């Protein structure tokens, strides 16, 4: 995960100080890209321990089209708690946009199912895109999407994906996002009969919060360890049939967890 540490180091050394919505302050650079070849291992950060359970359950929750934190809470995942209302609702966030984008004529568009079908039927299409950024509904969302749009690409029997992340919390958020989209590629590849290719991460406002600098320095002092592998139950052929038990992370070694506050 040298790519990730290089981004963190870039922002730590050359980031511009900016105010932000949370009042915490950030050091930021604009525009950065990282590439991860999934044949080289599963890109889960090793310079601190990452909570894979939260990553997997959050992705399954997105794919269900769910926008209430009840499922997450039932599975011991608290990463969305701070933004939910008293009923656990988050408004029309990721899952709603991915699975039920509202059209002007009253239809609801299942972007994920459409992309699965297009990958199978027309893999050379340049329209293999899913967007979570719906300007008409941004004000109804408790937190507008940070990872806003992603595109799949098929070449030589391999499925790749590029994400555009408008807002990238490098210390806390980005390791989750990298692992989540890498896992989505593995799942999509399996159900479409392709091999996993690359995950390309493109960031807009890439930032370290001002109260994460000591944690970033500690992480930068650590040497990356070999990447693990992720095994999926090969019998699952329907993207929406995956369960938590269908994933096994093999060979994950990491440095200890580093605690840091979440900016709300």
From Swiss-Prot:
Gene Ontology molecular function: thymidylate synthase activity
Family stated for the protein in its record: Belongs to the thymidylate synthase family. Bacterial-type ThyA subfamily.
Sequence intervals crossing the membrane: none
Gene Ontology cellular-component terms listed: cytosol
Pathway named in the protein's UniProt entry: Pyrimidine metabolism; dTTP biosynthesis
Enzyme class name: transferase
Keyword terms: Cytoplasm, Methyltransferase, Nucleotide biosynthesis, Transferase
Presence of the UniProt keyword Mitochondrion in the record: no
UniProt: (6R)-5,10-methylene-5,6,7,8-tetrahydrofolate binding residues: 51, 169, 263
Location in the cell: Cytoplasm
Active site positions, chain numbering: 146
KW Methyltransferase (keyword) present: yes
Assembly and interaction partners: Homodimer.
Function: Catalyzes the reductive methylation of 2'-deoxyuridine-5'-monophosphate (dUMP) to 2'-deoxythymidine-5'-monophosphate (dTMP) while utilizing 5,10-methylenetetrahydrofolate (mTHF) as the methyl donor and reductant in the reaction, yielding dihydrofolate (DHF) as a by-product. This enzymatic reaction provides an intracellular de novo source of dTMP, an essential precursor for DNA biosynthesis.
GO biological process, one term: methylation
Protein name: Thymidylate synthase
Residues that, per the record, bind dUMP: 21, 126-127, 166-169, 177, 207-209
Enzyme Commission number(s) of this protein: 2.1.1.45
Pfam family of the protein (one): Thymidylat_synt
């Amino acid at each position: 995960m040298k790519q990730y540490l290089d981004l963190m180091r870039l922002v730590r050394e050359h980031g511009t100080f900016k105010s932000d919505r949370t009042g915490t302050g950030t050091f930021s650079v604009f525009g950065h890209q990282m590439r991860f070849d999934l044949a080289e291992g599963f890109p889960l950060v090793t310079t601190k321990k990452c909570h894979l359970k939260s990553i997997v359950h959050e992705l399954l929750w997105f794919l269900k089209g769910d926008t209430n934190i009840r499922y997450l809470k039932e599975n011991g995942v608290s990463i969305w708690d701070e933004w939910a209302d008293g009923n656990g609702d988050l408004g029309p966030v990721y899952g709603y946009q991915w699975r039920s984008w509202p059209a002007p004529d009253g239809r609801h568009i299942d972007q994920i199912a459409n992309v699965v079908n297009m990958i199978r039927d027309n893999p050379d299409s340049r329209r293999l895109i899913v967007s979570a950024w719906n300007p008409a509904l941004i004000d109804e969302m408790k937190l507008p999407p940070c990872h806003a749009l992603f595109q799949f690409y098929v070449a030589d029997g391999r499925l790749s994906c590029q994400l555009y992340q408008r807002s990238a919390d490098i210390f806390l958020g980005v390791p989750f996002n990298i692992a989540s989209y890498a896992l989505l590629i593995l799942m999509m590849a399996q159900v479409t009969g392709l091999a996993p290719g690359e995950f390309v991460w493109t960031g807009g406002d890439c930032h370290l919060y001002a109260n994460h600098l000591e944690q970033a320095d500690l992480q930068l002092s650590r040497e990356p360890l070999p990447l693990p592998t992720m095994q999926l139950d090969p019998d699952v052929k329907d993207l929406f049939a995956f369960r938590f038990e269908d994933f096994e992370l093999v060979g994950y070694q990491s440095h200890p967890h580093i605690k840091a506050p979440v900016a709300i």
